[in-house]
Amino acid sequence: MSSDITGTAAWQKLRDHHAQIQSVHLRELFEKDPARGQELTVSAGDLFIDYSKHRVDRDTIGLLLELARSVDLEARRDAMFAGEHINTSEDRAVLHTALRLPADASLVVDGQDVVADVHEVLDRMGDFTDRVRSGEWRGATGERIKTVVNIGIGGSDLGPVMVYRALRHYADAGISVRFISNVDPADLVRSLSGLDPATTLFIVASKTFSTLETLTNATAARRWLLGGLGLGNEAVAKHFVAVSTHADRVAEFGIDTANMFGFWDWVGGRYSVDSAIGLSVMAAIGKERFAEFLAGFHAVDEHFRTAPLEENAPVLLGLIGLWYSNFFGAESRAVLPYSNDLVRFPAYLQQLTMESNGKSVRADGSPVPASTGEIFWGEPGTNGQHAFYQLLHQGTRLVPSDFIGFGEPTDDLPTADGTGSMHDLLMSNFFAQTKVLAFGKTAEEIAAEGTPEDLVPHKVMPGNRPSTTILAPKLTPSVIGQLIALYEHQVFVEGVVWGIDSFDQWGVELGKTQAVELQPVLTAAEEPAAQSDSSTDSLVRWYRRQRGRA
């Protein structure tokens, strides 16, 4: 059994340090160290990161790095990059970083050159999407493809939809992309509304080609297609391709296995958007820009792999996240992108961090002695300012925040007076929010403005609310890759300190099997047997009455 991290000397030092610093205000930290705004920053690729508005000082950072070294973080990082089987519960390598290695790199894992394998699939993806984008690929009636519909769930959906929306300005071939994930039929009906079957191409993304939700939706989409075209099953091969590794099931569905794009067991779903799972993104933006996307990942991978811990952005941010979770008792982190193009980024990060680190046992099966897994949530600015920032500013819960902004916009328009820039207005809000969260406004300052005495307590802004500022020149394919990698490696850092396996997800399995067992109970003509608990039994019977099956 591995040692209890909370009983180590490094952890105890942090506990003692927290007792000293927890009552220190950010105003005081900046007064004592006026240079911290310039010095508590780090760069990774095109990302400029300011962590000076965190409730840390240089001693805090030193102690957090001591904790990281005490769990051999650097060795664990190197083991991941080398392809060792660090996913111990499934005895697998963890090699999402290999998906973005350049073609001239070499990485042999379990006797196989994985870089060659990755680029063979990328080349096939590029050839296929070139044909779709150019109009060479035609549907069963001879018309060119205008809409690509990605059918997947979890990592097969969250990544592609997030990246497609982020990079909408780079979709330059007249092809739009839609996404279907939920087994709720409303998702499919609305996603297919207004589409012409003759000009629609479906990508069915399921590694085993057996995922219940995905295959249910794919079958319904096939029925829609054939009904709309008035053709037989031979039309399927012109309108469906697969991202899968199960050729027999793909062929049985009617898809030509020549148009099946695979990936590997060493790629977890939530780390797979830069694999063949990103086929819909490549169809939209083209293979050259998809290569830029991969290069962005790789730039931050190399930073994480080689930068000293003191200058390593994912290490510092991961440790700071752990600092709030385990010493301040924070339970969530707000992700606040000041770009409407990143509207799905918080949801993407929810899966990345919560499925990875939402564990209660360590890799050796023993209980985790500390809280694990940050709850990520958020909305783009300035929408969030008019929704939940009230709690961030004046609530009783501590919610560290990540602000993400850009120097250049993807779109810009004049302000109301016709002269200014709406992007400048957006970013003035961005900088104002991080400032007010950190420094607030005291009762004395409010009273000095002539505020009625009875209103002063209501207007006090306590400040001391921590945030990270992440800036990049512009939201490009490379930059979105860098942002994703920045968070991927933070998740890894936290998982190593907690001693958990960040790359399995056993917690999602039981619900799947229970759903399969309950479906016939919901639909059977005869009265079902009593369920194992009275709540489920009562709920099932209510549902059956609503469906006319009582």
Swiss-Prot record:
Transmembrane segments: none annotated. One of its GO terms (cellular component) is cytosol. Its EC number is 5.3.1.9. Pathway: Carbohydrate biosynthesis; gluconeogenesis; Carbohydrate degradation; glycolysis; D-glyceraldehyde 3-phosphate and glycerone phosphate from D-glucose: step 2/4. The keyword Isomerase applies. The active site is at E355 (proton donor), H386, K512. It is found in: Cytoplasm. Keywords: Cytoplasm, Gluconeogenesis, Glycolysis, Isomerase. One of its GO terms (biological process) is glycolytic process. The keyword Isomerase applies. It is an enzyme of class 5 (isomerase). It catalyses: alpha-D-glucose 6-phosphate = beta-D-fructose 6-phosphate. InterPro entries: G6P_Isomerase, G6P_Isomerase_C, Phosphoglucose_isomerase_CS, SIS_dom_sf, SIS_PGI_1, SIS_PGI_2. Its main location: cytoplasm. GO terms for molecular function: carbohydrate derivative binding; glucose-6-phosphate isomerase activity; monosaccharide binding. SUPFAM superfamilies: SIS domain. Belongs to the GPI family. Catalyzes the reversible isomerization of glucose-6-phosphate to fructose-6-phosphate. This is Glucose-6-phosphate isomerase.
